[in-house]
Every structure is written in structure tokens, then in C-alpha cells.
Amino acid sequence: MSASRLPGKPLLKINGISIIQHVYDKAKATNLGKVYVATEDVEIQTEIEKNGGNSIMTSKNHQTGTDRIFEAVEKIKDIENIKYVINLQGDEPQISTEDILNLDKNVRKLNSKIGTLCTDIKDKKIFSNKNIVKVSVNETFRKNNYSPALTFFRNTEEFDEKFTYHLYLSLIHI
């Protein structure tokens, strides 16, 4: 909510529905399990809960989204049987349910502990944008649509365009 680039972004409306609600609805539509929004903001909690969704309040002191998810899982695990977590970015309303389901399928098929969904970077400006996390993969990824990530990075000094992707979401088995 307090992002410097676009304050309040999760609550901005697209076709009368907040961005965060669009993402929540996409997650729910997968029917993979219970969906929670982990947030530090009462406004986001209110938005999700007024539409019948589940939210978990977390600390404002987290350095990363992974830290926030860890806290949320710690709070939820005593009341829910959590096998894995799919971490969706709350500001990616165009994520497709098909992509979420494909990530789930591939992580299960490969018996992985973690998986990350990414996409080709088509806009050259994204390469130099330090606000966008990118991942470097290898030729195996190009052939099979999965491979170990070589590295995650924000800086762009040393990368090969051919093997660089923008991150969308990750799935973590617990």
C-alpha cells in the first residue's frame, strides 16, 4: 500500500474490482485449496474479507514477501493442514488460473520442494528495472519448461537475455 511507485496499488479498481480481489479470485478459481491473503494493511484485509475472502494480518517489519508468507503459515498451520503454499503477487491481476495450475502440476510431477513461474521478458525496459526480480535459467528450461534456477537478481549488469525471465509466482511445499 505504501509503495513509492504507485501507492495504494492493490486497492486500485479494474472494472470495478480491486487488483488484490482479482488476484484472490484467480487463486480461488483454481480449486487447489484454501486461499489467504497475507497482509500488513487493514485496508487490504477489509477489502478481502468484505468480499468473503480469508486474510491473515502480518507484521509491517518484513523485508521480503517470503518473510510475510512464513509468518502467515506459522499462524495458519495450527488450524489448517498445509501441504504447500502458492505465493501469488497481489499486484498481478492478469495471472491466469491455467498458469497457476500448470505450476502446481509441474512441481508435483517433479516432486520439487519449490517451483517458480516466470515468463519471457519482451520489453527491454524490464531488463534495466531494478524493481523487477528476474531469474536466470538454462537450456533445459527452454526445452522442457522447467529447470533449476541459476540465479535470482534485480541488477542487470551480467545476464544473458536468452535465459532471463520475469518472476510471477512461486509454490513452496511444506
Go through the PLM ranges and name each one:
Residues 97-126:
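Conserved donor-nucleotide/metal-binding helix-loop-beta segment in metal-dependent transferases, i.e.
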Residues 1-39:
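N-terminal glycine-rich phosphate-binding loop and ensuing alpha1 helix
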Residues 32, 80-82, 110-113:
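Short, high-confidence coil segments that cap the C-terminus of an alpha-helix
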Residues 36, 42-88, 92-105:
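Short phosphate-binding loop-to-helix
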Residues 172-174:
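Conserved small/polar residues in nucleotide/adenosyl-binding loops
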Residues 16, 58-60, 90, 137, ...:
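Active-site donor-binding loop signature of nucleotide-sugar glycosyltransferases
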Residues 120-170:
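Anionic-ligand binding region
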